[in-house]
Amino acid sequence: MNWHQACELPYYHGSDLGANPTAEGTTFKLWAPTACGVVVCLYATGTDAEPGAKELGVHEMRRGDGGVWAIVLPGNLHGTYYIYRIYFPDGRVHEVVDPYARSAGANGTRGMVVDLTQAAPDGWEQDRRPDIPAHARSVWEVHVADFSADGHSGVKPEWRGKFMGFTPDDTTLDNDGEHPTCLNYLKNLGISHVQLQPIYDYATVDESRPDGGYNWGYDPQNYNVPEGSFATDPFHGEVRVKECRAMVAALHRAGLGVVMDVVYNHTYHGESNLERTVPGYWNRRWPNGMMTNGSGCGCDLASERPMVRKYVVESVLYWATAYHIDGFRFDLMALEDVDTMNAIRAALDSLPGGESILLYGEPWMGGGTNLEGGARPADKRALDALHERIGFFCDDTRDCIKGNVFDAANAGYVNGAPQHGYDVLHSISAWRSGAHGFLPKRAGQVVQYVSAHDNYTLWDKLAAVGRRGDYDCPDANLLAQNRMTAGIYLTCQGLPFMQAGEEWGRTKHGDHNSYKGPLATNRLDWTRAHRPEFAALTAFYRGMLAIRRAYPRLSGAAGEPEPFILALPGWLIGFVPENDGTATAGQLAVYYNPERTRQWASLPAGTWRKVSDGVHAGVTPFGPCFRDALELAPTSVTVLVAE
């Protein structure tokens, strides 16, 4: 099906696709304009292998406007499982899970009718998004299983690695009552948002078995259904809905926003429920008919096609409203088209308080694709057309600070290649000079980071550059480089982002692509987090985050101009957030020293005290007063406040 044929298919303007139960009846609606017949098949269970499995009925649907097949069945069918059987003029018959299904049975082979009022945890109606000022935002990325699967986490065994592992707020290491873990730890770290790696239903974990495997989840199966392996009971579809919402509510009670990692750029395989519903419509193809694979791990969704765009926008809105999600991170955002991303931003903004919902993504793709109809990919070259509140991960910041992610031994500014200081200077002002071929409209568009789930952890990257094979040794040089790395991106304008555990030297022992496990490699090591040397590293992160919150100009979130760069020798960098170089009482001066020796740096006029010396950090000034000049510690970020 080419672009013109796709555009000739009828468009459905309603917002009620899927199964919608009320006390009077349950309406099923499916967009399948190329079908010649559709029936809905009802079941008592999510699979035929479960006790009580039986078919409850097969009902013929009728075609209406917009290519939609519909039927209304009596009663509220909450808890009933269903599929659609679709008949095509060429004789093909496809059985599919409803693309709009809100839940499913084990392994997602049947959808489930969900009345959201019957799948709400206690207090859900009182749940509210936390009010987090733009300058105070920072993101901490974690996988649901990684968060609490460690046997030392203090989370009870049946909740480890599950949505419910986020709900207790008093866990400690081995229940010692002293060393906080999980949410108890997170609520005092100083980050504002938790980004969850995919929590929708994905294909590569066997939900029917406790040991069904591990995967990051970038293999989407049912986009509007929570992943069953994260539920305490994957067989009853209401459980995953209720427990996912309970997780969100617990994070909200701790004052934390929730960002959802979404993968609307590709389907896991070419026979997805979407593609089997309207064959030839949902995925991009090359002129020879082969599906494009710009993600490198699946078949690209054609977001530029009208009903695909509608589906993506409505799916995002569903998670934002039904689960109170506070932000969305788009995997391989460059595979989405600009108009779709802008439509998502507009739709979120239309919600009460929706302008506070974060929206950002990866401005690259993993291979070639074939956008049609003049659509532009949502990459860094399209920032002129993207809404200013659609952000992007800055790989330039990532690589200049600590080295290129695709070359293990490649060094950056903090670990042996100080000449990258030219790029670090651009990072400070969120790359708003336009010197690197892209021009953000505002600082808040730029996600400033050095580590995420992909590639090496920060600690492992620093160890690789330093050729240190013992990842568990708290090497003093690596600790200094880690602190300096954090100190840089936490004083740059933009939105700071970190991988969970970066703040305690998280290691995967050199595994740079742990997407399918084992869990032992991926789970957070809460014992390591409380080893004295790594706990001190965490304290530094906590202090730098506190400084960032206390001094809003660091973020540039209110439209502040680029910082004033101080003239310093060699590869030293210094700046003051005030663009004219003045330093009134309470203002900051920031210095980076990438050298392994102490260096002298001149100070702006005035009297200064440290709030960070590269080892300790916090909002309370400490140590003596300084005027005129300051000796900077090796491999350090020093932050001073004017008296």
Predicted regions span which residues?
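The feature marks proteins involved in alpha-glucan
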Residues: 1-23, 52-55, 64-168
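Glycan-recognition and catalytic regions of carbohydrate-active enzymes
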Residues: 11-15, 494-511, 521-523, 527-588
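Carbohydrate-binding surface patches
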Residues: 20-36, 563-604
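Beta-strand-rich binding/interaction modules
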Residues: 30, 36-48, 598-614
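Conserved, mostly hydrophobic/aromatic
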Residues: 30, 84, 142, 196, ...
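C-terminal beta-strand-rich structural cap/linker in extracellular carbohydrate-active enzymes
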Residues: 32, 78-80, 622-643
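Conserved alpha/beta catalytic core and glycan-binding cleft of carbohydrate-active enzymes
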Residues: 114, 345-346, 350-351, 355-505, ...
